[in-house]
């Protein structure tokens, strides 16, 4: 199913209106190398984009490599006593800011300046330039990491960066540590100076373990700080599945609160076995199964079970051992179809032809009479997403088609227009493993490539 210009124009107009509210925001990252700045940047971009705010990361390191491709950027390039290199780095940071400002003026909403920005001289230059622009607010976001395990992991990940990709690993690590030592010589953390200037900032310690915020103002800044306070990097698995087949699925009706069919109950029983194999309740079964090598979680065997309040998801959880912790929540209910609840698509075409055409043109903002659209679902799922970011144990979520699409769009960073076209079949478990720069997704039978295929009309 292809999107036409007519289809996408509805969403474009909606985004224009949504992004008009409040000033634009620049987030300046601050911190030593390998402290999680890019990790935080990508998490924020994904969260804010999913909420409908145009968000983009501007990485100074990428521009630096292009601007001075003839020079080897080893540790000596970052020595504060290397005047030529220091001048180049400062200029590249300002050039990146110019590109960032130009993008904001052309319709962007949130821009992230991903760099060390570790000296007061650099930060004062950034403040001076961005303060000249009307309707652009800014804040600094410093990532501090003192956990040796996290640091070692971050350093190992740096081996995949363009600066070290073709270098012997041990040589690369030694050079990177020397680079960090050079940064430490000139590093000046956020604090009293920024407060005297009344600059907004947040300091994040050990990727979300602790946060300190100062002068945080406005909706976007507060959302960023709130989100950062709930993230972590612990391993865990998020299982997503739709309810078993319901009577309405069989009859081609939407919404409502129907029971499961016999086929749906068979899936419910199979789902309970699936969970027991991977997260056994009994201590004697604590040893992970062979299948757990693919699907096992980071929660040490503990599994939470979440369902919507609707009958078909509650019935899908019926066969689970009573010792599993079960939470039911309205946030996970299917998109509400208003006056069209319990109708078939043919019925809707006949009774509400104009509303049907509008919704088919763009499901993100189109809705049936008295019902929700996809953006409404995103808004009510925001607390669920934040809770999933906070949760350090594994969780199995039994929910519905549109909610599944919306959650998958968040975790994969999928474009919101593509989200409405995502095929999410019944009786299938998606196993999501959040990683530093994305998410691994697998079915029970192996690795999955999500394809955008013609979906059901719902």
Map each language-model feature to its residues.
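The conserved Walker
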Residues: 33
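N-terminal pre-Walker A segment at the start of P-loop NTPase domains
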Residues: 1-13
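A glycine- and Lys/Arg-enriched "phosphate-lid" helix/loop adjacent to the NTP-binding pocket
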Residues: 73-87, 130-190
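Phosphate-binding P-loop
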Residues: 17-23, 104-105, 388-390
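Phosphate-coordination/substrate-recognition cap region in phosphate-metabolizing enzymes
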Residues: 115, 123-124, 137-157, 233-235, ...
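NTP-dependent small-molecule kinase module
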Residues: 13-21, 176-239
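Conserved substrate/cofactor phosphate-moiety recognition/catalytic segment
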Residues: 38-101, 107-108, 122, 150
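Active-site-adjacent alpha-helix immediately C-terminal to a catalytic or transition-state-stabilizing loop
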Residues: 314, 382-440
């Amino acid at each position: 199913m292809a999107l036409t210009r007519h289809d996408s124009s509805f969403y474009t107009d909606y985004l224009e209106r949504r992004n008009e509210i409040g000033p634009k925001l620049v987030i300046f990252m601050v911190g030593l190398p390998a402290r999680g700045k890019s990790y935080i940047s990508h998490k924020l971009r994904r969260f804010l984009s999913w909420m409908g705010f145009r968000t983009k990361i501007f990485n100074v390191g990428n521009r630096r490599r292009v601007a001075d491709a003839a020079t080897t950027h080893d540790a000596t390039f970052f020595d504060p006593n290397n005047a030529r290199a220091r001048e180049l780095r400062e200029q590249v940071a300002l050039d990146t800011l110019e590109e960032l400002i130009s993008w904001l003026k052309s319709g962007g909403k949130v821009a992230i300046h991903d760099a060390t920005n570790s000296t007061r001289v650099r930060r004062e230059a950034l403040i001076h330039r961005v303060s000249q622009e009307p309707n652009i607010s800014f804040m600094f976001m410093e990532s501090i990491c003192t956990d040796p395990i996290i640091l070692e992991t971050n350093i190992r990940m740096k081996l995949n960066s363009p600066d070290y990709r073709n270098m012997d690993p041990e040589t690369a690590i030694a050079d990177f540590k020397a680079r960090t030592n050079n940064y430490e010589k000139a590093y000046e953390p956020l604090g009293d100076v920024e407060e005297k200037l009344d600059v907004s900032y947040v300091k994040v310690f050990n990727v979300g373990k602790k946060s300190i915020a100062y002068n945080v103002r406005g909706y976007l800044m507060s959302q960023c700080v709130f989100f950062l306070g709930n993230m972590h990097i612990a391993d865990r698995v998020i299982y997503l599945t739709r309810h078993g087949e319901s009577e309405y699925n069989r009859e081609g009706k939407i919404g409502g609160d129907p029971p499961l069919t016999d086929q749906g109950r068979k899936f419910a029983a199979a789902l309970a076995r699936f969970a027991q194999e991977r997260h056994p309740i009994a201590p004697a079964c604590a040893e992970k199964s062979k299948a757990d090598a693919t699907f096992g979680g980071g929660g040490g065997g503990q599994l939470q079970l979440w369902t919507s309040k609707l009958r078909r998801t509650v019935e899908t959880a019926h066969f689970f051992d009573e010792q599993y912790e079960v939470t039911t929540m309205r946030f996970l209910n299917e998109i509400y179809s208003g006056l069209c609840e319990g109708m078939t698509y043919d019925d809707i075409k006949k009774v509400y032809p104009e509303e049907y055409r509008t919704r088919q043109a763009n499901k993100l903002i189109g809705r049936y009479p008295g019902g929700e659209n996809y953006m409404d679902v995103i808004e009510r799922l925001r607390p669920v997403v934040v809770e999933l970011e906070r949760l350090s144990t594994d969780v199995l979520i039994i929910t519905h088609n549109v909610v599944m699409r919306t959650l998958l769009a968040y975790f994969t960073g999928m474009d919101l227009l593509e989200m409405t076209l995502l095929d999410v079949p019944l009786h299938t478990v998606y196993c999501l493993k959040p990683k530093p720069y994305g998410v691994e997704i697998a079915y029970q039978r192996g690795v999955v490539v999500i394809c955008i295929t013609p979906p059901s009309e719902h």
